[in-house]
């Protein structure tokens, strides 16, 4: 499993759920919406680690 995604705070998890729901309202499938949000989280985590 992806440790970066396992360490999300409750607030970050809630924000991710809201992003997924918004994408699904736009007609994107749930699987694709989850993948999009997960990729965004990974990219954000990677950028944060590179700045350290």
Swiss-Prot record:
Alphabetized InterPro entries for the sequence: UPF0181
Cited Pfam families: UPF0181
Origin: domain of life: Bacteria
Spans through the membrane: none
Family the entry assigns: Belongs to the UPF0181 family.
Matches recorded under NCBIfam families: PRK05114.1 (NF003476)
Full protein name: UPF0181 protein HD_1137
């Amino acid at each position: 499993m992806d440790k970066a995604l396992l360490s999300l705070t409750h607030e970050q998890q809630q924000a991710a759920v809201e992003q997924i729901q918004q994408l699904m309202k736009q007609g994107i499938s749930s699987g694709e919406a989850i993948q999009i949000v997960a990729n965004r989280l990974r990219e954000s985590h990677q950028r944060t680690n590179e700045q350290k």
